[in-house]
Amino acid sequence: MFDAKRVSEITGLLKRKRAKRIMVQVPGGLKMSVQGLSDALEKNGFEVLVSIEPCFGACDLRDREAKALDCDALLHIGHADMGVEAVLPVIYYDYFMDHDFVPLLRDFTNHIKYKNICLVTTVQFLGAIKAAKKFMESRGFSVRDGGKIMGCDSLQAKKYEKVVDCYLFIGSGRFHPLGLQERVGKPVLFLDIENRRLENLIGEKNKSEIRRRLRIEKARSMKNFGILVSTKPGQSKIKLALKIRSGLKAAGKNAYVLVGDCFTAEKLLGMRIDVLVNTSCPRIRDDYEQFNKVILNPEDVEEL
């Protein structure tokens, strides 16, 4: 998956930074090929360390670990720079997937009943957007290129909300299109390239709001609140957590700031916590079944 062209591009980036010892960080989907990349970079004179911690995005840099191990740079593959401040140079390498959306679109465009569409995807499929847009326009659609979105960031696409009838997300995984659907009033269509199906997520927005209201109502009668603060550099919001803690205490609740890297139910064993307030990644709220606790977002606390 890291062919000679990609290895050459990465080598050039590392040489421009004059890096010798580097830590490589990849998302889970690329771990099967990271050893081959490590071997190739070692042959080019670099000393390579491979991070095996989960990688959820450019918010989740392992720069402090790299610094502690005397690395000259962190090579972060597969996610775009989010502007997260790091303690050593971070080299971002976009890993674009060689994928053609057109064959799938050919099967599903007749099922799309909207005319004005904003087309979006994730960063690894950006190279496929131009051809997809051209194909849809040839079928009579008016298409805006909304570029890349993430489950936690859809500002670029949201600016088209007033001029389109719907959004069309083409890619894999529901986290990103559901995140967009929560932020816009127009329907988000999810064309799933893995399962080859088209889904309208507007109904999920209504269900999500009902679940949110139920969580808030349940939390009102509960006493012990744990406020999750991530140590991941792009997710850490300690000031917000302390503000929430003060507000909860003023309302007569017991509130504790809980700090961690990755949050799991096992890490909370032995603690008397009724409600979790998530100031970290939005994905955590979707894991309420794993935690078996009420999980609120910061804005939900204001409605208690």
PLM feature segments, named:
Residues 1, 73, 261-271, 286, ...:
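Asparagine-biased alpha-helical interface segments
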Residues 2-9, 14-206, 210-211, 260:
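The feature marks the mature, well-folded catalytic cores of soluble enzymes
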Residues 79-82, 172-175, 232-233, 281-284, ...:
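Short glycine-rich anion-binding loops that position phosphate/pyrophosphate groups of nucleotides
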Residues 80, 273-275:
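Binding-cleft/active-site segments that stabilize strongly anionic ligands or cofactors
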Residues 85-86, 237, 286-291:
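Glycine/threonine-rich flexible loop motifs
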Residues 175-254, 262-270:
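Redox- and metal-dependent alpha/beta enzyme cores, enriched for Fe-S-associated oxidoreductases
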Residues 194-198, 203-205, 279-304:
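Peripheral docking tails and interdomain loops at the edges
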Residues 258-261, 277-278:
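A conserved acidic, glycine/proline-rich C-terminal tail/linker
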